[in-house]
Every structure is written in structure tokens, then in C-alpha cells.
Amino acid sequence: MSVQEDNKQDFGSEHWPEEIRYLSEDKTLVVRFDSGETFTFPAEFLRVESPSAEVQGHGPGQKQIVPGRRHVGIMAIEPVGNYAVRIKFDDLHDTGIYSWQYLHKLGREQNDLWQAYLDHLAAAGLSRDP
């Protein structure tokens, strides 16, 4: 996937993907940005950090813990205009629209977000396993 240089300002994103590739065997999504940064996202991580209201809630402090997604995969990745992708997971979740900004943020904060997720699972007595 490539994005034209002159479209960057139109959508208010300072980070644009140069390549988005799903590795089905590893269940990972690789996103390479024009900044030179490349992030590898496990499908499970993207699922539990979905930007959908179902996961994030409708306001601060409403984020839901999504357990049991250790083996989730991605069925489809669809472009949404020039600013995002919709990821369809094999657990049938498909309401998250991942903007370039959000994907870049997830990449930069992946370790901290993943640890927070694991901590919340443990505190709630929940598991990554289905």
C-alpha cells in the first residue's frame, strides 16, 4: 500500500504507512511508516487495543478488558479512505477503524500497552486463553 505524498496534509496525519503486510502464519501485522519506523503487531494486541467503542468505551475510564484472544487472527484488512484501515478479526470483531495516527501510537507504546493489558487481565482473574 502506498500513499501519495501530497495527500498527507489533507487528513491531518503526520505518520503515513508505506507498507502494510499481514503474516498469517505468525498472525502479525507489519506496518512500515514513512518515518522509517517499522512496527510488528500481533493480531491479539490489535484486537484487545481496538479503537472501537465496544473496546474503548464512550469516554475516559470506560475501556473494556478483552480476554481470551490469544489465538485470534485477521481475516481481512480494508482501506478506509486515505486515513485508516478496518481490521476484520476471525472472532468476527470488525468495528475498529485504525487510523494511521492510532497505529503509529500503538507501535510507539506497544510494550507499555501490552504490559498494562496483562496486568489488567491478572487483576481481574482473566486469561489470554479462550
Predicted regions located by residue number:
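Motif-centric detector for short Cys/His coordination patterns
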Residues: 1-130
